[in-house]
Amino acid sequence: MNPPTPLPALTEQQKLLELVERYGRNLHSFMVFEPGLSIWFGEDSAIAYTAKGGYWVAVGGPLCAAEKSVDVLQEFRSAAQKHGCGVVFFGVTQPLVDRIADTDFDAMQIGLAPIWDPADWDNVVRGASKLRNRLSKAKRDGIICRKLSLDELQSGSETRETLCRIADQWAMSKALPPMGFMVTLELFQHSERRR
């Protein structure tokens, strides 16, 4: 009996998709697919980053099991140090900040990203007058929110062209560098997997 043929190694994109599906739990998880970012792979983990000014600046936290996140951060830092670089983690979640509290990593809050639980949306709106005002204005302006089908996002579709135009106008209206890599818009890559 012949030994089984080994499966081909997963490509980097396939590995990332698998890690995002298993461990993608925050705002920046899908940014691992954005152009211009490097990917560091650990064992069953990955971190997207860019090299800036002697640092590896990570985009969000690691894609890994939550209980392994501190170990993964330390492995990433060791890899950066081998290249003469320090590390900075930008756009991480509060649970990760809490996990590093008793380590030699430091944390500093720079800003907040609004995050809501869709199951609790009615309570969120009830408790936020500014949000209610913005939603009312959007409604008066005829803006609606709905889930798009994959067909509507196909290359050449009117919806996709409109979304591209809106995204381009937004990006051109912002002064993005030096942290522009945090807001690169690659709206349609792996759109069938985005939630």
PLM regions and their residue ranges:
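Conserved acetyl-CoA-binding loop-helix of GNAT-fold acetyltransferases
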Residues: 66-78, 87
